[in-house]
Amino acid sequence: MNQKEIDHLESINSFYAKGDYMDQLSIEREIEIIKQYPVNGKSVLEVGCGSGYSTERLIKIFPDYEVIEPSQKNISLLKQKISNIICHNVLLEDFSSKRKYDYIFFLNIIEHVEDPIESLKALTSIVKDEGLIFISSPNCMSLNRRAGYKMGTLETYEKMAPKDYEVGHRRLYTVDMLTDHCNQAGLKVLSMKGIYLKPLSEKQMIELGDSVVRAFHALGEEIPQYCATIMAVATKKYY
């Protein structure tokens, strides 16, 4: 058990406890993409549940559902929403199971972990041979970050914003970087999706209103390289 890592995760719980409107919209869009794949009879493992916002919605689609969550504070938030869910209170690196899952949801987690490639390898070992792993992360080459760089408000594309540090991000991704990490872990990316084409700052987007923001969330699906969030749908290369 890596107590330092658990302490790190507990320290950012306040973000999940208070909730975030824009993050919730992104989660809803991620779920819409997941629903494009077969759902009946699929066993699911979600790695990291945050406040439980995604879990509460996904378990209605996938009744055979388990969660890995190392933060006891996050588990408490989850249990307030779903009291009877199977939840493993361990780090991914410490999770041991004879069971293999049809789908694994690794949504907005890879940017938090110490060693992303090792984490992906761990997922590869517990997904079924033809199962799918859904991996989402913030994109440092998003349209708004490209604009910020051109305006001189962003020193480099890779530089993280204050909110990134607030929520415990260790890195930001690009489409190529996420694809490469999957490849190194023995995964093949079947599809790369974009979530939230974000041309303006978060504050400016919110001021445009809910319907506009939702439209831009959907608009970016086929142009991931410009979106605020990217999602890889991956499967094992070898089995």
Q: What kind of feature is each model-predicted range?
A:
Residues 1-99, 103-107, 120, 194-197, ...:
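Conserved N-terminal segment of class I S-adenosyl-L-methionine
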Residues 17-21, 25, 53, 114-125, ...:
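S-adenosyl-L-methionine-dependent methyltransferase catalytic module, highlighting the catalytic core
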Residues 42, 130-131:
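Surface-exposed loop/turn positions
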Residues 44-46, 127, 164:
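Short glycine- and Lys/Arg-enriched binding-loop motifs that mark or flank ligand-binding interfaces
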Residues 98-102, 115, 129:
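Active-site acidic short loop of glycosyltransferases
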Residues 108-112:
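A short His-aromatic
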